[in-house]
A protein has these predicted regions:
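Non-catalytic, soluble scaffold/interaction modules
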Residues: 1-179
Length: 179
């Protein structure tokens, strides 16, 4: 038996099976095409990511639907799209451009005073991670729990949490903060 001690987000004790959620790395090493082709790939990936979010929103519980709508709106943000396009124009691949722009935008939002807005940084990273998955041809991971478990991850994103069967989640352990 292994004991894990951490800073609790709420009172209580959880004992159970541990399930690890490891987000796969993006395919930043793939060949970069022309800026025009990379921009087209980015636009197509955004549309596909938005379609995925619409499908998730339709299946989600009423209290969770806003998460998917917010992420769809974030993917339409003109500033984010221009930031991605600027990296593509100078020769970066679409996936690398999305990841870089997402990091910059998330950093700006984390610096805001409004706590609600700071929370949106995670939504930007989550939505952009979905776009990168589409660009890389990887399915977006969803964790399917088969029994009660403690979920361990470096970081949990909003869509990770709302797509889980919460009746099976005994607790969360993250190294990057609370979900």
């Amino acid at each position: 038996m292994k004991y894990i001690t951490a800073v609790p987000a709420s009172a209580g004790l959880a004992v159970g099976t541990v399930r690890y959620l490891r987000h796969t790395q993006s395919g930043l090493g793939r060949a970069v095409r022309s800026p025009k082709e990379e921009q087209e790939a980015f636009e197509n990936a955004v549309r596909e990511a938005q379609d995925q979010l619409i499908r998730l929103e339709r299946r989600a519980a009423a209290q969770d639907r806003d998460i998917f709508m917010v992420q769809r709106v974030l993917l339409e943000d003109e500033g984010l799209r221009q930031e991605v396009a600027s990296y593509i124009r100078v020769g970066a691949g679409a996936a690398a451009s999305v990841e870089r722009a997402a990091g910059i935008f998330a950093g700006r939002i984390r610096a805001l005073e409004d706590p609600y807005m700071r929370e949106r940084a995670c939504d930007i990273l989550d939505a952009c991670r979905r776009v990168v998955k589409v660009l890389d041809g990887q399915p977006h991971e969803t964790l399917r729990l088969t029994g009660p478990a403690i979920l361990v991850a470096e970081e949990l994103y909003p869509t990770d949490i709302v797509t889980l069967d919460r009746s099976l989640v005994l607790g969360f352990i993250t190294s990057a903060g609370s979900p």
